[in-house]
């Protein structure tokens, strides 16, 4: 897979320079390229305890992106997933440590322990006050003698950084860091491994599987599970965390490992706060990307019980744009809809034949969901199938509340339902269509003529005509042929839909933004949906 890099050798130095040049002057680096890559606060005066962290790169924004007032004083950057050298760590200590001393915060990996530990020993020999804490929050492998340090490291940065910024002594800052480390538990999950720049991707995790407990360098976890959904993913992680949690109030960090969309992270957040540990969670950090694994399609959950002091330190401000702040978890606030926009309530009536026909139409659309999405992905945003299938499910769910025995009112009611439940332009257009069908039907028009009135209204407002590569290209000929029966309408709809694959310039709809190459040979998904509907009805008659 291609990546936005120049060459593998300069990845870290170029990334560090990009970070510094866009920091507004808040950051600087030591003059030691390429072997020494140390990011420091540009305003640091050595009057307080310094906090230094670091390790291999690839976990951004950790650690260089967490340098700033209220968190780290300096970050020592190694190459991707490789510990920095002893000299690089020592240079950071010497550059930022004053009379108050410094605290090294490292993750529990052999290279980091050795290199930071030796640098600390050398600095102490030179007369500097240096303490070191090791984060080991990973609970994925419970029998491991030396658990890994992962996203919980960020909590240590924030709490220790806030206390240091408030003027805490080295011993006080070290103690609060140790307390947080002792209480923090983290577990991760991913649908995929990460892609190390310049290297082939490890395809260890098969499609349909999710790995629980993998590391932030792509190290294998302890278990592969069948992927079901977000709820089950959270449940699997909570099952590991819950036995280790006390009854105290906790902070939770919901961390994006780099490749999960914001939309998905919000769904995971909802599942997390509603999980079996939800009542123990008082504060949340995230969802946010804080300790990543380059582009890993995964996330981690860190929990830690809180004292009043720790809570205050977590909530204290810090001058970092990447920090999402620590917020209270609150019930969802719901505001009443304005008058006129409350959910539609109809006068329901029963008509078994009509109910069967509507259900059949909806089921045809639901069955076509995957095919329509795949077709739409070639010339649009890939959601046509989900849109029409979702509308179909909503109509089925609302069926008992519809005026099934009064067709003019039924058409209008379907239009109102679609305007509320069906998104996108297709939802609006179909709402217009059925509302107009209802109007024409109430004025005595036959069903076919009412449908044609609906099409005319939809075209007048939407602006699409025959040949513009939209659903109109299938719907218009189908309605013209409907007097001759459903089979004739289905044939006409299919011919119209197939013809859209030869139309290389779309004049309406999202396809207007797509070039000819992508349109060539591909049927418009809206027209395909219409053809599928008439074909399905014809086959079942």
Question: Where are the regions that the model predicts?
Answer:
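N-terminal loops that bind phosphate or other acidic moieties
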Residues: 1-541
């Amino acid at each position: 897979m291609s990546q936005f890099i120049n060459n593998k050798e300069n990845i870290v130095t170029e990334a560090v320079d990009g970070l510094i040049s866009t920091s507004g002057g808040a950051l600087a680096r030591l003059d030691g390229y390429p072997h020494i890559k140390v990011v420091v606060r540009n305003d640091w005066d050595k009057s307080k305890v310094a906090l230094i962290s670091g390790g291999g790169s690839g976990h951004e924004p950790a650690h260089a992106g967490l340098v700033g007032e209220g968190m780290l004083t300096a970050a020592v950057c190694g190459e991707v997933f490789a510990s920095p050298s002893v000299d690089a760590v020592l240079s950071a200590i010497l550059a930022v440590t004053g009379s108050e001393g410094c605290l090294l915060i490292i993750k529990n990996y052999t290279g980091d322990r050795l290199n930071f530990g030796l640098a600390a020993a050398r600095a102490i020999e030179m007369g500097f006050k240096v303490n070191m804490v090791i984060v080991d929050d990973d609970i994925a492998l419970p029998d491991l003698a030396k658990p890994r340090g992962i996203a919980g490291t960020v909590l240590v940065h924030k709490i220790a950084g806030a206390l240091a910024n408030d003027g805490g002594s080295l011993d006080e800052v070290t103690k609060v860091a140790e307390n947080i480390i002792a209480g923090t538990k983290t577990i991760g999950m991913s649908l995929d491994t990460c892609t190390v720049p310049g290297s082939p991707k490890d395809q260890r995790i098969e499609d349909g599987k999710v790995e629980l407990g993998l590391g932030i360098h792509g190290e294998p976890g302890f278990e592969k599970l069948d992927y079901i959904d977000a709820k089950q993913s959270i449940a699997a992680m909570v099952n590991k965390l819950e036995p280790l949690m006390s009854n105290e109030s906790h902070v939770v960090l919901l961390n994006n490992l780099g490749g999960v969309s914001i939309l998905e992270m919000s769904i995971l957040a909802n599942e997390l706060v509603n999980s079996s540990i939800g009542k123990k969670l008082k504060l949340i950090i995230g969802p946010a990307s804080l300790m990543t694994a380059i582009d890993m399609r995964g996330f981690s959950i860190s929990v830690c019980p809180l004292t009043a002091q720790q809570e205050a330190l977590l909530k204290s401000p810090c001058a970092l744009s990447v920090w999402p702040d620590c917020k209270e978890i609150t019930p969802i606030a719901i505001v009443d809809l304005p008058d006129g926009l409350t959910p539609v309530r109809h006068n329901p009536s029963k008509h078994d034949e009509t109910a069967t026909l509507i259900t059949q139409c909806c089921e045809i659309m639901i069955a076509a969901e995957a095919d329509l999405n795949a077709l739409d992905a070639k010339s649009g945003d890939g959601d046509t199938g989900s849109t029409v299938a979702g509308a179909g499910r909503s109509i089925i769910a609302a069926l008992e509340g519809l005026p099934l025995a009064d067709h003019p009112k039924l058409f209008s009611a379907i239009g109102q339902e679609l305007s509320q439940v069906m998104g996108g332009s297709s939802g609006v257009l179909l709402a217009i269509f059925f509302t107009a069908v209802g109007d024409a039907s109430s004025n005595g028009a036959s069903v076919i003529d009412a449908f044609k009135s609906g099409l005319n209204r939809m075209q007048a407002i939407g602006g699409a005509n025959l040949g513009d590569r939209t659903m109109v290209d299938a719907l218009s000929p189908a309605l013209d042929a409907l007097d001759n029966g459903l089979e004739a309408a289905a044939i006409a709809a299919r011919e119209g839909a197939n013809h859209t694959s030869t139309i290389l310039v779309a004049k309406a709809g999202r396809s207007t933004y797509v070039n000819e190459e992508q349109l060539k040979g591909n049927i418009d998904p809206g027209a395909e949906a219409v053809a599928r509907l008439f074909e399905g009805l014809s086959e079942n008659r």
